[in-house]
C-alpha cells in the first residue's frame, strides 16, 4: 500500500509550531510524519533547529495514528549510536508500532561547529556502517559486546525495548550506502528532483543488489522518498516559495566547507529562482502535480513524504488534503 507522509522541516519552524503542523497532518489524512534533525539550519534568517529526540516524544503524545520518524538523524559523531539505540527503543515503548529511526551519514554543518572532527568520506561510511550494526545489535541482544574500530560496547544492555521492533531506514544518495540500505535496513530514504536516471539506473539497482545479499527483494523494504513539492494556484507564488530552501540547489562543490548558516544563506540567496526551483515539483494545477508525483510511484517508491517550502504550512496541509491526497489515493485504486 502506498503511504503518504508529511516532512516536518525542523530547520524552518519552531518546535511548538512544528508540533501543531504534525497534528494537522494527522487530521488531514497523512500516514506519517518525518522530522529532520539538524544542529544548525540551512538559513540563519528565520532559521530553527529543534532537537528531534525530545520533539518526537511530544509528537507521539500529541498524535494517535501517524508513523513518526527521523529523516534523518546521524548516529556517528554528535550522537553515540548506543544513545540513539536507547532513545529510539524508549520511543518505541511509548508509541508502539509508530516509530521509525531514519539514519544518514550527515553534514559537516551539524558536527564541526561543536569542535567535532569531520572525517573523509571513507571513514564516514565506515563509521556509519559500524554505528548501524551497533544499534541493531543493542536492539536485538540481551547483553552486547562489540569491539569495533570506532564504537565499542561491553556487556551493554538496553533494558526497555519495545515489543514491536523499531524499523531502521537508511538514507543514501550514492550506490555504496544504498547497497548498505538494501542489506541491513528495513527501509530506504532518498530525495526527489535529481533526475530519473539516478533512481532507475543507480540507486534502485544498488538497493536490490544489497537486498539480495540478505536474501531479500525490494518488496521486503519500504522505499521512501522525500518529495520536494511546491503546489499553489498562483504559479509565481509557488516558484518564489522555493527560495526559502535555495541551499538544496547548491552543488556539493559549492557547499564544501560551508558550516555557517549565515554563509549558506548568502550562497543560496545569490541563486536565481529558476535554479532554486530546479529540485522541486512546482505546480499550479492539481492533475499535473499528481502526474509528476506519480512518476516516482512508477519507479517503485512506496512511501512519499511531502516537503513544502512555504511559511504557511497550515495552508499547504489543507490544500493537499483537499486536492492532492484524494487524487493520489484514487490513482492508487485505479492501478491496484
Curated annotation (Swiss-Prot):
Presence of keyword Glycoprotein: no
Presence of the UniProt keyword Chaperone in the record: no
EC number: 1.1.98.2
Keywords assigned: Carbohydrate metabolism, Oxidoreductase
TM spans (from-to): none
Gene3D superfamilies linked to this entry: Luciferase-like domain
Annotated GO MF terms: coenzyme F420 binding; glucose-6-phosphate dehydrogenase (coenzyme F420) activity; oxidoreductase activity, acting on paired donors, with incorporation or reduction of molecular oxygen
Entry function: Catalyzes the coenzyme F420-dependent oxidation of glucose 6-phosphate (G6P) to 6-phosphogluconolactone.
Assembly and binders: Homodimer.
Family classification: Belongs to the F420-dependent glucose-6-phosphate dehydrogenase family.
Name of the protein: F420-dependent glucose-6-phosphate dehydrogenase
Species assigned in the record: Beutenbergia cavernae (strain ATCC BAA-8 / DSM 12333 / CCUG 43141 / JCM 11478 / NBRC 16432 / NCIMB 13614 / HKI 0122)
Source lineage: Bacteria, Bacillati, Actinomycetota, Actinomycetes, Micrococcales
Amino acid at each position: 500500500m502506498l503511504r503518504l507522509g508529511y516532512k516536518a522541516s525542523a530547520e524552518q519552524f519552531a518546535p511548538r509550531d512544528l508540533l501543531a503542523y504534525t497534528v494537522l497532518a494527522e487530521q488531514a489524512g497523512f500516514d506519517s510524519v518525518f522530522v529532520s534533525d539538524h544542529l544548525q539550519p540551512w538559513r540563519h534568517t528565520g532559521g530553527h533547529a529543534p532537537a528531534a529526540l525530545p520533539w518526537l516524544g511530544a509528537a507521539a503524545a500529541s498524535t494517535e495514528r501517524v508513523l513518526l520518524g527521523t529523516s534523518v538523524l546521524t548516529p556517528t559523531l554528535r550522537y553515540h549510536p548506543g544513545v540513539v539505540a536507547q532513545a529510539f527503543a524508549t520511543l518505541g515503548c511509548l508509541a508502539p508500532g509508530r516509530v521509525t529511526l531514519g539514519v544518514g551519514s550527515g553534514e559537516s554543518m551539524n558536527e564541526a561547529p561543536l569542535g567535532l572532527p569531520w572525517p573523509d568520506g571513507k571513514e564516514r561510511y565506515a563509521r556509519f556502517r559500524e554505528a548501524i550494526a551497533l544499534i541493531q545489535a543493542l536492539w536485538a541482544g540481551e547483553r552486547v559486546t562489540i569491539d569495533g574500530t570506532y564504537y565499542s560496547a561491553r556487556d551493554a544492555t538496553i533494558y526497555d525495548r519495545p515489543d514491536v521492533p523499531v524499523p531502521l531506514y537508511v538514507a543514501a544518495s550514492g550506490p555504496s550506502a544504498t547497497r548498505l540500505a538494501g542489506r541491513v535496513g528495513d527501509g530506504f530514504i532518498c530525495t526527489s528532483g535529481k533526475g530519473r536516471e539516478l533512481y532507475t539506473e543507480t540507486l534502485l539497482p544498488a538497493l536490490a543488489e544489497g537486498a539480495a545479499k540478505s536474501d531479500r527483494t525490494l518488496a521486503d523494504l519500504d522505499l521512501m522518498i522525500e518529495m520536494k513539492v511546491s503546489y499553489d494556484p498562483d504559479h509565481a507564488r509557488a516558484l518564489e516559495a522555493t527560495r526559502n530552501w535555495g541551499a538544496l540547489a547548491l552543488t556539493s562543490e559549492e557547499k564544501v566547507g560551508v558550516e555557517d548558516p549565515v554563509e549558506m544563506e548568502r550562497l543560496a540567496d545569490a541563486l536565481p529562482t529558476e535554479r532554486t526551483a530546479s529540485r522541486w515539483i512546482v505546480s499550479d494545477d492539481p492533475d499535473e502535480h499528481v502526474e509528476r508525483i506519480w512518476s516516482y510511484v512508477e519507479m517503485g517508491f512506496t512511501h512519499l513524504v511531502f516537503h513544502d517550502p512555504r511559511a504557511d504550512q497550515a495552508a499547504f496541509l489543507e490544500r493537499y488534503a483537499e486536492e492532492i491526497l484524494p487524487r493520489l489515493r484514487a490513482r492508487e485504486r485505479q492501478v491496484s
